[in-house]
Amino acid sequence: MIFFLFIQAVLNIALVMSDPDMEGIYLFKAQLIPFLCALPFIFKRDFRKNFSKMLYSYCGIGFLSLAIDYALRSHVGLIQLATVFVPLALYGLFHFAVWNVQRAKERFSLAALAMSSLSWGLYAFAFPPLPLGPGALVFLVPWFIVLLRSNMQTALFASFWSGFIYNVINYYWIYNVMNVGPAVLIMIGLILLISYFSVYNTIAAAVFVKARDVKIKGIPVLLILFPLFYAGLEMTRSIGDFSFPWSHLGYALGNQLPLLQALSIIGIFGYTAIIIASNLAVAEAFVKGKKFLIAAPVVIFALLFGYGSFVLSKPEAAPFYMENEAEAPKVAVVQPNIHQTNKWNKAYYDSVVSKTWQIVNDSVDWKSGDLDLVVLPETAIPDFIRFRSREKLWLKNRIKGTQTSLFIGALDFDREGKPPRPVNLYNSGFLFRPDEKNYTRYIKTHLVPFSERLPFDDVFPILNYVDVGQGNFVPGKERPVFEPYFWSPFICYETIYGAEARRSIRNGSRLMVDITNDGWFGKSTAAAQHLNQLRYRAIENGYPIVRCTNTGISAFVDQYGHEDLKTELYTERVITRRIPLRSRDTLYFHIGDAVEYGLLGFFFAYLAALFIRLKTWASAQP
């Protein structure tokens, strides 16, 4: 083994010293040499006996060589990258397959998988637009029964694959969003993404199994606190470049407005904790005979419904209360219904823009004279606006002589980027005012990972050389508020981040205007789920919302979550109404940041407490 390591070290040092004069991700055939020299060792008995150690050593030396090469010259050899990570990935997949085969041979493991799949399969159908939301309070009971009765290996097996099924059902539409490259790469990427999401279920299962038997003075404290841990686990999906906080469990109750009013107190993560607590209580009732716990879902439902009904019975909670006040702006939302395949095809550009302009001219009520704002969707101009003088002139002329502003989505760029992309690309919104010569630009701050940008491309500039058809946008930093109606622009994916809504309100905003192109989702449930998430933001913060989409669902949402003029998918519509500005203060607006970062801290504290308790318990054993 020492000879093998020596050979690999010498070869990798030689590769680093060879210093190929190439930029970015480069091809250098000599990087195959360490891999080819490693192959003969496979036929040695000692190598096969210590295959894992040899493989990890080989990959470790190769990774160190890659890191040094990147640190010195800011480039990476594609061949070396492949010869280091592909063997490790194949080895991991082999062991994962063997582990799954072993679990599948166990009858109880298959039964556990069936029960867990029933749970998560049902839960996937609890989200809007389906009306099964209240079932979320009991759908996960079979999964928790499995976790209460299974060993670690069975729990992990059942949780990963049932999570995979759940995520396939819940995220099947991602294929349409990712459809920007070779089909094989898209499918591989989709499988990896679904697997990544499923890891969260697996982590929850592993922690639960470890925590279930830990007691402090006979009380299963960690088990009692598990709902808060799960909420903290969901919070981890809201931070970092990989963040994708789309399907938090609490979103399942979105179709029942009375059930949502407690969002103003506990927010989305509080709802997740309540749902986990309800399911765990019923599972405990079945497994441990604590029959009184079986009433938990009924009690929780009654409390949520009772509180929500009380809140909605107040006069100020009437739909769009104070809509006729002078300060309530009159807003027109244009849904042009441009098919996605035409939208980004240059051959259709003129027809796409002409159709949009015709709708704006013919269907918007310009004659009333009291229209304050016209809103068009994300990338309604499917090009860089600074190259389109004709379109800018048309927009300025359209609002000239009126009191109406116009907000529209388009692309933009500047030349302040870094190599290899000296140009920064922006997904933007542009506000045209009748009394101003120039427009005001807003840049989208949260970009969809892998679709609009590669995660950590600012930390590792080498990723800017990777091109598999994804967007290469740069995020903005500002959260502006536009006068005179104190509204803040949001673009698409940003609205699922509660912290951004609170940030805009702290900046003085009293109305959210969201533009999006949900045409990427196709005819799927994603558009309804997206609107549902906006509804949660409205109730959490008492924040009215105007939503404008390309293909639907456009709508107006008031500060209690009432919806009005909700459009159908793939219809051409213009909807217009007055929308009252924010006049409701909520507890969660004030404590939301503390709650969410508190849950994040609790997540890590829970893991630390579990580790310390298990270590103490193990050391106390004879």
Model-derived regions, located:
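Membrane-embedded alpha-helical bundles of multi-pass enzymes
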Residues: 2-316, 523, 534-537, 548-551, ...
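Short, conserved active-site loops that position catalytic residues or coordinate cofactors/metal ions
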Residues: 127-142, 166-173, 335-336, 369-384, ...
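Acidic/histidine-rich helix-loop elements
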Residues: 177, 339-354, 454
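Membrane-interface junction motifs in transport/secretion proteins
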Residues: 267, 333-345, 379-380
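Hydrophobic alpha-helical transmembrane segments in integral membrane proteins
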Residues: 300-332, 339-342
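Short, well-ordered beta-strand segments
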Residues: 330-334, 488-490
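Solvent-exposed soluble domains appended to multi-pass membrane proteins
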Residues: 348-350, 373-622
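Phosphate/pyrophosphate-binding loops at sites that engage ATP/ADP/AMP, CoA/4′-phosphopantetheine
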Residues: 359-372
